[in-house]
Regions:
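Long, low-complexity, compositionally biased intrinsically disordered regions
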Residues: 1-178
Length: 178
């Protein structure tokens, strides 16, 4: 979103669609979204594509804590083919490949933060946008209920949010004695 006003419009539309309309967008919502600048509409379109391909996953633990994980389209484009999106990673048991929260496969998304580089570059550093396409996809998916679900144990949720160090010697940074 190119402005706080644009972000506010999208948040209002998503909240209304979720609470009042059972996840359905109305013509009035369309009119509100149509008032957004073209760059914001491109982000909405990119986020809608992520949601339409079922790349948004809500990860929930028994404690009730949850977050959204959005799969990257880049891994499919790098293969220079339009591959079918598989949700095997969502339905399979937890494994170590699911720990990484950023990079080529997944981005961990919250209402206020995303682990993608675009969030850091365009939202945090230069401020032309109020959110990235992954955060917008999370918002749209939550409003419409159109997302995959993944149940994990609390320890696995913690590992997904804060992966253990991968470089030898970095473990001292996370030792309980520090």
């Amino acid at each position: 979103m190119s402005s706080a006003v644009g972000a506010s419009v999208l948040l209002l539309v998503a909240r209304e669609a979720k609470q009042r309309n059972g996840g359905q967008f109305t013509d009035a919502h369309g009119e509100m979204l149509a008032s957004l600048p073209p760059e914001d509409l491109r982000l909405v379109q990119a986020a809608s594509e992520l949601m339409a391909r079922d790349l948004v996953v809500k990860v929930t633990a028994p404690s009730g804590r949850s977050f959204f994980r959005v799969e990257s389209l880049n891994k499919y484009r790098r293969k220079e083919q339009d591959a079918d999106v598989s949700v095997d990673s969502v339905t399979q048991p937890f494994d170590e490949s699911m720990v990484s929260g950023n990079g080529a496969n997944y981005y961990n998304c919250f209402s206020h933060y995303c682990t993608c580089a675009a969030f850091h570059d365009t939202v945090v550093t230069t401020h032309p946008l109020a959110m990235c396409k992954h955060m917008m996809a999370r918002l749209l998916a939550d409003a419409t209920g159109r997302y995959q679900t993944m149940q994990v144990e609390d320890i696995h949720l913690a590992q997904m949010l804060c992966p253990p160090p991968t470089v030898e010697g970095d473990d001292r940074l996370f030792s309980p004695g520090r």
